[in-house]
């Protein structure tokens, strides 16, 4: 083939370290906007960034030129450093080392975006741990419970 063509949507989820301060509600829009910019700088196309005070959800179109692990590393490393400079409250801010990345079909991208937009509502009914376990079960991802949501 003369061209390398891809269209891979990713739903990425990552959580703060348990020893890290939560992201203050008023700062969430700025954090989401910055992460959106980082995704685009990595050559990907950010469609939605959202989440709550302790975790992030984003859906984006993965660049054909960048491996997912590199994109995630850049997003987490640069956003962590940036968040620490917002306010002294965040001096010990850090993301956990792990993450969940799940493929999203073209037909469910809008549904995934809507899900991310309603994070506040979802977490009135269930914890992050419950939500994340649902994703792992849905995608049939095997994981070690000993290291689940651990720094």
Features from the language model and the residues they span:
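Basic nucleic-acid-binding interfaces
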Residues: 1-151
């Amino acid at each position: 083939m003369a061209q390398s063509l891809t269209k891979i949507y990713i739903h990425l989820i990552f959580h703060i370290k348990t020893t890290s301060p939560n992201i203050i509600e008023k700062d969430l829009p700025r954090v989401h906007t910055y992460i959106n910019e980082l995704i685009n700088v990595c050559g990907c196309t950010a469609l939605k960034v959202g989440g709550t005070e302790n975790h992030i959800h984003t859906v984006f179109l993965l660049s054909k030129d960048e491996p997912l692990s590199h994109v995630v590393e850049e997003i987490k490393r640069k956003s962590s450093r940036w968040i620490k400079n917002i306010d002294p409250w965040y001096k010990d801010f850090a993301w956990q080392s792990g993450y969940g990345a799940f493929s999203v079909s073209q037909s469910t991208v809008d549904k995934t975006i809507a899900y991310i937009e309603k994070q506040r509502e979802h977490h009135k009914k269930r914890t992050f741990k419950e939500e994340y376990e649902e994703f792992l079960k849905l995608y049939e991802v095997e994981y070690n419970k000993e290291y689940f949501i651990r720094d």
